[in-house]
């Protein structure tokens, strides 16, 4: 059979790993696919790096558009990142009837609807693939194994970089900046780590997951930059609830065992028991492996609707405003140690129908007149908590900002 020619756009950390994985496992992939699959052209602005990674064995160019327009290329792997050039390259590749594999979550989350109608029109055997590292098994389960099931909620740790940083900080007592530098040295974090540490990458993944679970696509990028890293999504009567933020969960939940650069995702459906998917998330090889797997699957004609539903069935579901979500809360505040402060705080909470589950006041350090107060609340509405925190912070006896963490049982 005719070999499958792959054009690789971008040969940085992930691109270099993808080239290595596909080259190293070439014989195994060929046995499974029934014919050879090989990267035959690479595009990168750094030609010297491209030649170094490929060993000068294949054609390299700094013109990515030449590859997406090359009739000899069957599959385009886009690993450049970003919204602008990557978008034009993907659109051009689709127009030219090529299969596209991309690890660019931001591009898919924000521009899926630009691609789906064109991709369907071209009637190719596979559309855009969404290699989201450890959560891709969940995608397969939803799209292929749970097609008759209604998923109620999913929750997880879906950014390996932030999980690594938090694990290192806890275990070694290191500062955030020091651990971030180590993550960058190990290749777990990008030179500009904003997308990871601000929760934006996790939000992109969560938006795509929500689209796959609930026919929801038009609003994929709404509110991305305003999302506050456990990630939670569920469907309610009022709309889809999407949240990306640090969360306290019971120690007995399996998600609590997810450490270092690993990621995990748990979900529950009406007809199935809770399931959990776990694996390495940060680093070149896990990402490259996911990309290589999708290249192999694309050639073998493994085709399902890419957002789990037929394109003409997708709808625009509302995202529940963050003020309308319900959660229990952990609050930590620093207050002057004097009579009446606790009474003021509890009055503020009570006036807003916020019930206290437990409260601890720590003793002040020697020579200090301020103490930490920790409050656990029962489930309440977010907007009520916002109002309460603003009122508490306005009290003269309160120093600084109130620390707030949401708490989830993950059993609803």
Curated annotation (Swiss-Prot):
Keywords: Amino-acid biosynthesis, Branched-chain amino acid biosynthesis, Isoleucine biosynthesis, Methionine biosynthesis, NADP, Oxidoreductase, Threonine biosynthesis. The active site is at 205 (proton donor). GO terms for molecular function: homoserine dehydrogenase activity; NADP binding. Signal peptide: none annotated. Substrate binds at residue 190. One of its GO terms (biological process) is isoleucine biosynthetic process. Its EC number is 1.1.1.3. PROSITE patterns: ACT (PS51671), HOMOSER_DHGENASE (PS01042). It comes from the Bacteria. It catalyses: L-homoserine + NADP(+) = L-aspartate 4-semialdehyde + NADPH + H(+); L-homoserine + NAD(+) = L-aspartate 4-semialdehyde + NADH + H(+). InterPro entries: ACT-like_dom_sf (IPR045865), ACT_dom (IPR002912), Asp/hSer_DH_NAD-bd (IPR005106), HDH (IPR016204), HDH_cat (IPR001342), HDH_CS (IPR019811), NAD(P)-bd_dom_sf (IPR036291). Residues 330-407 form the ACT domain. Pathway: Amino-acid biosynthesis; L-methionine biosynthesis via de novo pathway; L-homoserine from L-aspartate: step 3/3; Amino-acid biosynthesis; L-threonine biosynthesis; L-threonine from L-aspartate: step 3/5. The keyword Amino-acid biosynthesis applies. SUPFAM superfamilies: ACT-like, Glyceraldehyde-3-phosphate dehydrogenase-like, C-terminal domain, NAD(P)-binding Rossmann-fold domains. PANTHER family: HOMOSERINE DEHYDROGENASE (PTHR43331:SF1). Belongs to the homoserine dehydrogenase family. This is Homoserine dehydrogenase. It comes from Methylobacillus glycogenes. The gene is hom.
